[in-house]
């Protein structure tokens, strides 16, 4: 990923979606971009994978302007549904959004991602982050667009999450592994004679 200009973080933030309101923001952006601009059928855009994925929402001065989705597989993560409102294209918000997504993927210990991009956008993606077209994979089409598959190498994270993590760290909200979670504040010592439910 090309470096994110430090001043971009004064204007943009990218966070994991954890609430229904956050998911509505994601849906609104994707509807504006994919359903309206690209005339994608609803059932193709909202394909049954949203509730088993991690979503990030990009905000510009608190206003939702972009989103992406990550799905998790055994050996790789899959980068999907990157959408920016037209007014945000060509601005540094995309790099803020991708950096946040790549940080989560790296922290989980993944070394690579796959992306399925519209072939016409290959020049944009090849300039935005280090990736390569996957050789031997033929183009494919849906919703009236030609797609290609790309591989994105993810650098090793020095604090990747492991099997031996502190139990509280891995029950914290997605992407907030270094911040004490609600369950840590609810810890009560067992009372004499108490039994597990």
Question: What positions do the PLM features span?
Answer:
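A conserved beta-strand-loop-helix scaffold within acyl/acetyltransferase catalytic domains
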Residues: 16-19, 23-88
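Terminal substrate-recognition subdomain of acyl/acetyltransferases
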Residues: 1-15, 106-107, 116-197
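Conserved acetyl-CoA-binding loop-helix of GNAT-fold acetyltransferases
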Residues: 84, 89-103
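Short active-site oxyanion
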Residues: 54, 109-113
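Polyanion-binding and phosphate-handling cores
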Residues: 43, 49, 58-60, 68, ...
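A generic structural signal for beta-strand entry/edge sites
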Residues: 74-76, 112, 145-147
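Conserved hydrophobic beta-strand within the GNAT/NAT acetyltransferase core sheet
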Residues: 79, 113-117
